[in-house]
Amino acid sequence: MTYDAAPDPSARQGRKTVNESQDTPLSEGSWQPFLTVNACGRDWTLERAADMEALWESMTEFTEDERLPYWTELWPSSLVLADWLYQRRESLRGQPCLDLGCGIGLTALVAQWLGANVIGMDYEPEALRFARRNAEHNAVPQPLWTVMDWRKPAVKRRSLRFIWGGDIMYEQRFAAPVLDFLEYALAEGGAAWVAEPSRAVYDTFRSMLVNRRWAGRCVWEKNIEA
C-alpha cells in the first residue's frame, strides 16, 4: 500500500508513503550472491553479501544501535517502491532526490535510471560498496553514494525535492528521527514516500505525521510474492 502524505497548507513540506503486505526477503530459500528481479519493465541484477542470517551469526558484538545486516536482503517493499517511482518518473526527472537507507541500491538505481539526481545513503559502508557494484552491473550512472546517519544529516537544509525509503523502520524509536530528517532535508513543496509492510511501528510514524501537521493518504498498494 502506498501512502501520500502532504503537509497542511499552513505547515511545512510534503511527503508520500508506500505500504504493502509482505515482510519476507525476496531471496528466501537457498542463498545466491546475485539476485535478478523485474521492476519498471526491465530486469535488475543485484549483487549482495552473505544472507542476513549468516552475517548476523558472524557478528561478535552489538552496539547501542544494534546494526543488524538488514541491508543485504532485498525486501518486497523495495519492489513496490520501485514501481511507484516509475509511475512518478516525469516528476523525478532532473530533481534532487535521496534514497533513505538504500541498502544494495535498487530504488536509488531505478530513480537514477529514470533521470533523477539521486543520493543513495545508508548507515552501513558495506551496503554502499554493493550498491556501487550494482550500478555497474545494471549500466546505470552512479548515484552519489554516502554513509550517513539520519540523526546527523549531511545534506543542506530543505535541499531535496523527493525523499523515499523502503521498509526503513523496525522499532518505534526510529520514527521520530526519520521524521526529523524529512523535516530538515525536504524542500518546500517536496514529497516523501515510505514503502512499508504494515508493521506496527509505522502506526507510530503516521501518528507523528498527524501530530506535526502532516496529512497522509495511501496512494499505491501492491502484493508481492516472495
What do these predicted regions represent?
Residues T2-A226:
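S-adenosylmethionine-dependent methyltransferases
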